[in-house]
Amino acid sequence: MCGIVGFVGARADMQEILQGMMDAIAHRGPDGQGQFIEGQAALGQRRLSIIDLEGGKQPMFNEDQNLAVIFNGEIYNFQELTAELMRAGHTFATRSDTEVLLHGYEQWGKEMLQKLRGMFTFAIWDRKNETLFCARDHFGIKPFYYYQNDAGELLFGSEIKSFLAHPGFKKELNEEQLPLYLSYQYSPGEDTFFKGVKKLMPAHWLEWKAGQLTVQRYWQPKFDPDDSRTLEEWEDEISAAMKESVQAHKIADVEVGSFLSSGVDSSYMAALAHVDKTFTVGFANKQYDETDYAQEFSKHIGVKNYAYRITPEEYWANLGKIQYHMDEPLADAASVALYFVNREASKQVKVCLSGEGADEFFGGYNIYKEPFTVTWYDKIPLPIRRAIGAVADLLPPVHGINFLVRRGKPLAERYIGNTNLMDEHRKKKLLKNYHPGKLPTDLSRPYFELSKGQDAVTQMETCDLNLWMVGDILLKADKMSMANSLELRVPFLDRKVFELASHIPTKCKVNANQTKIAMRGAAEKTIPAKTADKKKLGFPVPVRAWLRDEQYAGIVRKAFNTPAAEQFFRTKELNAMLDQHISGKRDNWRQIWCIFMFLVWYDEYFVKR
């Protein structure tokens, strides 16, 4: 695990520029650094040593020194691929997974990507042909950004902040991303909040040659339900697949720990992993605290649990630092709790296992129950439901109103992913300049087309796998772990596990009363039934309550009345939204937090820097 940076474009001070970019991501790799500069190419890497502690240094070269690679991540089938490549005549100088990329690219070219099992971004510079080849893993576990300026220079790296050290980077806000963010609570799609900066999307490669940039998808995850097996058979297959995946994800030359919340995902993983240490965070308020459960469960499986309770003061004091590490604004309040659990874990281990991906693969979100509730309402003709929904949208928010509004639209219109904080009408009221380049449905539509003809839950899962998981779940997992120089591994997000999960029918995933049906059944083979059936809190955070406390609401109010807030928002509307929440008239906490996090992020990148 590490961080990578680089650029293509000859300059007199390339070494100094590259070092500045590397320094910006030093937190990703405190164990060492490496550089390669030749002609117009500059590659840099910061290393967190996990496998082959002495021999895995980067940049790494092939036998004839023609290819140079920098790599962020882990290839879990590297031993199998090493053996295959050695049989084909390749000679290995190390026992690291990095070297597999060099020989694999020599042997198979771009087709190598179909063989890799792991989390990765990498860049290979072909010295002979002066070509740059980069790729991102199948699910987008590791981040990769790129930027091409008017002079044709290409900048790339694990974090956008590294670009600030390059004189060819022009820092400009992409204000068109703001309306999308206000719906999603994260920055969705390939565009970012920085003009010209793009994300290399999951399962895509990028190639640069003679100033020309080509970006292409190499793999597409797709659900293909199979009704031929029983629930018990699916449970057995999940159990076997997860045991194998967890063991593959434990390969390391350093100690591995595991995160532990009160939910089935992390409990199941901790029990399968047989690690010595688990890590949990919570709050003094018992409603938002999982530490007692974690310590009890850790005793049950015979491991030591390290629990930490976050105070409100330190939660709020670290918001700026956290938004800085995110690179783009993220309004997921759990990201702060994730920062602290990574911080505490990094004091004990270098690698932690975590449960990301289980909800998207196995049907874990409560909203997936929606198609099974009040099904009679869907039998009412759509034009009538639309009319009822339009009227309901004008009424005060009381129990049941949101249901009428949502069910007044077809699924592809109402479901843009796991979050939908604000509709276009509300955004128009709040924003001074409402000029969206894209609407949320423009981003979700391709995934409904991909899953066309499938049931509603499968369509929702497809949407979340490609939007919510990449834009929120995996963003915060990577940025919060790397901010603390900790490698986070996600055994659920494995190609072999997905190959299985993609065929599990919805009836074995979700019904009106339960989520992750088959996965919970598989977990019961390893952990107590009461744990397997437990509802996940998911790093719960008491932000709703804090925003009704003047001590913390006052911090938000101050931000809502800054010049930055005036620049983008109608501050009268912002203050009214906050007043409604404080008084209890409306529950606006998620919308308030979304705007507040944007302002905190903007302050970090466009006011302070």
Spans of features found by a protein language model:
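Acceptor-substrate binding/catalytic loop of class I
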Residues: 330-332
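Residues that scaffold the ATP/ADP-binding catalytic core of kinase and kinase-like folds
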Residues: 84, 166, 361-364, 500
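Active-site adenylate/phosphate-handling loop in enzymes that bind or generate adenylated species
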Residues: 340-398, 468, 474-497
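Cysteine-centered catalytic environments shared across enzyme families
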Residues: 1-326, 338, 342, 524-525, ...
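Generic recognition of stable, solvent-exposed alpha-helical segments in well-folded globular domains
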Residues: 16, 173, 233, 237, ...
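Acceptor-binding helix/loop patch of EC 2.4 sugar-transfer enzymes
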Residues: 160, 374-375, 520-521
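Short low-complexity, flexible loop/linker segments enriched in glycine and/or proline
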Residues: 320-324, 346, 368-370, 546-548
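Adenosyl-5′-phosphate
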Residues: 1-4, 165, 196-202, 212, ...
